Amino acid sequence: MRSEERQLNLFGTSVNWSWPNLFKEREAPGMQLYDRALLFAVLSLICFGFVMVMSASMPEAQSLTGNPYHFAIRHFAYLVGCAVIAAVVLRIEMSRWQQFSPLLLLIVGIMLVAVLLVGTSVNGATRWLSVGPIRIQVAELAKFAFTIYMAGYLVRRHQEIRENAKGFYKPIAVFAVYAFLILMQPDLGTVVVLFVGTVGLLFLAGARLLDFFALILTGVMAFVALVLLEPYRMRRVTSFMDPWQDPFGSGYQLTQSLMAYGRGDWFGQGLGNSIQKLEYLPEAHTDFIFAVIGEELGFIGIVVVLSVLLFVALRAIKLGNLCIEIDKPFEGYLAYAIGIWFCFQTVVNVGASIGMLPTKGLTLPFISYGGSSLWVMTAAAMILIRIDHERRLSSIQAVQGKKVNDNREY
């Protein structure tokens, strides 16, 4: 197959865009070259996110800048960046990601050090690197880089991970370095995401149960220690357990979020009609945008949004299974990791806004306002599209090779 034919063509003539078959994969491997359902789901979430950011951010934007569309305009600019990132990522072969995963890990590690030295501080946290008018939250890049590194490591040291502790604890040492640098910002939420992804991948790779449970126990103990040693983290935990004990202090944000859900009822107050976003609910367009969705679109709206997010995560897990079956371990582990990442971050964000988990400062994938998060999530989603594209090409080549052999025998 010629190189130009191997490129991912999202609008190729072989694609049938009939709506009844949009979420149904055809059995014939040559009928389509990418996962239309996954792409449609991701684009739907991104477009929906833009609408909700515009709705949730207008009161605060008006108060801070005098322009109610300030955050919406910035969010649109971020989406332009997403389009550029998608175009670039879709053209990179998966073998390149595997080849340069250690280099990517090193570059992001250097950026994490740079954040501590020359980073920009906001609300007491130093998490951003300023590049001209753009501020990059390097911890988001760390999720991306570490996920790719872990997938590559599991392929290179697969047998070693299963047979001895040395192979198991090497990536844990790398994780510990990343975790230390990120905790210095401080950003415990990102560390938890990295830890869960690491544990999940090591389990899928067949690590010994003794090492696996020792890692989980160590992680839980470290998390408890980090919470107990920092008063502000302890306040978050105690306030989430009973926010009504101090509704105008440590429990204020959560109580306002719960009020938003209560007002939403089954069908919501209608798009744009949220009361809590009128500067009652802090971070209404970022970490707590799901509460605004609940208030404006109701229980039905949040079920639909969660269903689409779950679909994306499960599609990634399914893709991982398919890749493992055809002996593409790097692509399989990476798809697994991205699915775990999307699912866990969604659970933490939603859990924090409904009072089931302490606040961690994690965004709702594809929906919350924030350039770095959007860009990284888009890159991860496009990697899934690229993985599936290469898998389908392999299937096409296998079928064509079989036909050639059958013709020769005939």
From Swiss-Prot:
Subcellular location: Cell inner membrane
Name recorded for this polypeptide: Probable peptidoglycan glycosyltransferase FtsW
GO biological process terms, semicolon-separated: cell wall organization; FtsZ-dependent cytokinesis; peptidoglycan biosynthetic process; regulation of cell shape
Membrane-spanning ranges: 38-58, 70-90, 100-120, 132-154, 164-184, 187-207, 209-229, 292-312, 337-357, 365-385
Stretches in topological domain Cytoplasmic: 1-37, 91-99, 155-163, 208, 313-336, 386-410
One MF term in the entry's GO annotations: peptidoglycan glycosyltransferase activity
Involved pathway(s): Cell wall biogenesis; peptidoglycan biosynthesis
Statement: the UniProt record of this protein carries the keyword Iron: no
Family: Belongs to the SEDS family. FtsW subfamily.
PROSITE patterns per UniProt: FTSW_RODA_SPOVE
Enzyme kind, highest EC tier: transferase
Periplasmic side stretches: 59-69, 121-131, 185-186, 230-291, 358-364
Main localization category: membrane
Regions annotated as coiled coil: none
